[in-house]
Amino acid sequence: MGKIIGIDLGTTNSCVSIMDGGKARVIENSEGDRTTPSIVAYTKDGEVLVGASAKRQAVTNPKNTFYAVKRLIGRKFTDGEVQKDISHVPYGILAHDNGDAWVQTSDAKRMAPQEISARVLEKMKKTAEDFLGEKVTEAVITVPAYFNDSQRQATKDAGRIAGLDVKRIINEPTAAALAYGLDKNGGDRKIAVYDLGGGTFDVSIIEIAEVDGEKQFEVLATNGDTFLGGEDFDNRVIEYLVDEFNKDQGIDLRKDPLALQRLKDAAERAKIELSSSQQTEVNLPYVTADASGPKHLNIKLTRAKLEALVEDLVKKSIEPCRTALNDAGLRASDINEVILVGGQTRMPKVQQAVADFFGKEPRKDVNPDEAVAVGAAIQGGVLAGDVKDVLLLDVTPLSLGIETMGGVFTKIIEKNTTIPTKASQTFSTAEDNQSAVTVHVLQGEREQARFNKSLAKFDLSGIEPAPRGMPQVEVSFDIDANGILHVSAKDKKTNKEQKVEIKAGSGLSDEEIQRMVADAEANREEDKKFQELVQARNQADGLIHATRTAITEHGSKVGGDVIGKVEAALSDLETAMKGDDKAQIEARTKTLEEAGQSLYAAAAAAEQGGNADAASGNAQASKAADDVVDAEFTEVKDDKK
């Protein structure tokens, strides 16, 4: 059995980890970094860039560079959060046929957020494979604890498109608790995991206990906001910079995708700098231009100003903490440790707000960027049997139920119920002689069904005619360990049953997933061919350089016909390198190698010939010296001439 890798698929950055020698190990990517930007770019020549390379070219290719798509995954285009994001990103967001939010490139190619996320997952998969030296097919992938069923299913679909069998979907705060608590001793304790990442926020209250020699991680309650994170903090800075520039220059930079991308990068940098300094300067020369010429942006930003801009966002993260504590039946003073996860928790204002609420300083010994991936790897180790004596008890974050008469939401499974779990409830018909019922499955906390998230609708038909209220229809909900729901409805009299795995009215159809899997496979093959072509070009380039050096050093020693053959082979190879035919490049590389060998052989022969001539000349000189007869001479003075 191969390794089950752990992947933190983040809004801003992603990370991959494996169990290695009983310890979780974060793997560096091909650039040598332990985290990878969750950014995917499509270039004009058809190349797909992922991670740092995609981020580097974002300013020059803003409409085809996709970031923060995790905020769109499993969401409808009409969602208020999606509409809010449209004005903040330079790329296109539009509605797919089923109403889902999809993204669009500058040449009108449409893609599901799952496809973009799959590219990031492929990069994580390749990173692990390069390290292990073997193929990886199984993974544990993390999601925000407050992700609903649609978002979880969409994440699983992204894994499938990337060629991964997703063995488990695990909540991010729970993963962080695993990373923190696995090797900690010291008795039972309750911890709060405050996870403020790039695009989402979660808080989980978790009890770590020793039960019969087994370390048990039980989630007592979870809460959060799937549209609150570092991106929102960045957007506040962007809005401030745009407004200040508009006041000064009378130009609205929101309408310029290139300027917007530069502002995005600058805002993120400024925010990070202000975590360690009191003031920074945002300087963007030539940010735009009008009839009077180029315009430059130069604005000072203080930590105090930044904190004022985001104060309501920080406060917004505290309310779910209060709710989670209440749901767990605890007070802040009952919490033994507070763990911070997610890059945005490096902001001093956030740390202070958390410390004030819980009444204790958060721990600083957990890496906020890596803890979630480490926890995912540990869960992978548990599933593979490599990690023993660990039990993880997670919960469903939102209540699940159906719509009943009068548009009421009737809960069947309450929020914060430990999963996996099953629950059933019996309902009846609303009209006389009703032969079918429609089961409308919902997720949420509102009393009115229409305000909750619709997951699916299906019909149970074949009910025997009877007065209203007489037939008995049993509706059963079954949540698996991934938090994904299966629903069935059964007429108790006839035993007729209808089952459905909730794929949500949104989400990808099996046909769409299969197409995307096929596209990903084709792209993997294309990527492989591209790498092989680059390798062939690099080899050819090295040979050309070496051959030219050889001509310079040895050209004067060999005949013109040898040099002519080498020059011809050089020219042919240089021509081949302008194209994309790998076979031709390799064939002409071989021809040049052979011509080069002839050059070296001729040069060596010429050198040996030169040495032979020198030896012959020395012999003649020696013989002539032997024929000389010694004689005595009398010196003749000039005055005797």
Swiss-Prot record:
Entry-linked Pfam families: HSP70
Region Disordered, residue ranges: 606-627
Entry-linked Gene3D superfamilies: 1.20.1270.10, 3.30.420.40, Actin, Chain A, domain 4, Substrate Binding Domain Of DNAk, Chain A, domain 1
Transmembrane parts of this sequence: none
Any GO molecular function: ATP binding
InterPro entries: ATPase_NBD, Chaperone_DnaK, Heat_shock_70_CS, HSP70_C_sf, HSP70_peptide-bd_sf, Hsp_70_fam
Protein's name in the database: Chaperone protein DnaK
Lineage of origin: Bacteria, Pseudomonadati, Pseudomonadota, Gammaproteobacteria, Lysobacterales
